[in-house]
């Protein structure tokens, strides 16, 4: 039992001194700051299907799309639930909405 406690303490000490930009919040969420993507596939392109903006000038917009395992490539502050697969959303506030990820019904008909 003592060995287990010592191992856990060492794990926290080593984990706390690394320079990774990850934080565990009180809500069981993993916060990634300035995360980097190793691939530039379709899912990492900045886009948003569920964007809401305030009526202020300039507007303050936030995307509420949920993505698996990471946020889009332009996201500066990504929060991921500690689940498998991780469900992530970007908490950045911008003054615009990104292009939609999915084509609208009108686009499909043309």
From Swiss-Prot:
The record marks 55-56 as: Reactive bond for trypsin. SUPFAM superfamilies: Bowman-Birk inhibitor, BBI. Disulfide bonds join 47-101, 48-63, 51-97, 53-61, 71-78, 75-90, 80-88. InterPro entries: Bowman-Birk_prot_inh (IPR035995), Prot_inh_BBI (IPR000877). Keywords: Disulfide bond, Protease inhibitor, Serine protease inhibitor, Signal. Residues 1-19 form the signal peptide. The keyword Disulfide bond applies. Pfam families: Bowman-Birk_leg. The record marks 82-83 as: Reactive bond for chymotrypsin. One of its GO terms (cellular component) is extracellular region. One of its GO terms (molecular function) is serine-type endopeptidase inhibitor activity. Residues 20-39 form a propeptide. PANTHER family: BOWMAN-BIRK TYPE BRAN TRYPSIN INHIBITOR, BOWMAN-BIRK TYPE PROTEINASE INHIBITOR C-II. Inhibitor of trypsin and of chymotrypsin. Belongs to the Bowman-Birk serine protease inhibitor family. This is Bowman-Birk type proteinase inhibitor. It comes from Glycine max (Soybean). The lineage of its organism: Eukaryota, Viridiplantae, Streptophyta, Embryophyta, Tracheophyta.
């Amino acid at each position: 039992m003592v060995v287990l406690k010592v191992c856990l303490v060492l794990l926290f000490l080593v984990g706390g001194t690394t320079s990774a930009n990850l934080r565990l919040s009180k809500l069981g969420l993993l916060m990634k700051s300035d995360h980097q993507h190793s691939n530039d596939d379709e899912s990492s392109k900045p886009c948003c299907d569920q964007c809401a903006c305030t009526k202020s000038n300039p507007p303050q917009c936030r995307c509420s799309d949920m993505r698996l395992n990471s946020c889009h490539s332009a996201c500066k502050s990504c929060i991921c639930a500690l689940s498998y697969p991780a469900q992530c959303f970007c908490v950045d506030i911008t003054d615009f909405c990104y292009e939609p990820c999915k084509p609208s019904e009108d686009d499909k008909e043309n």
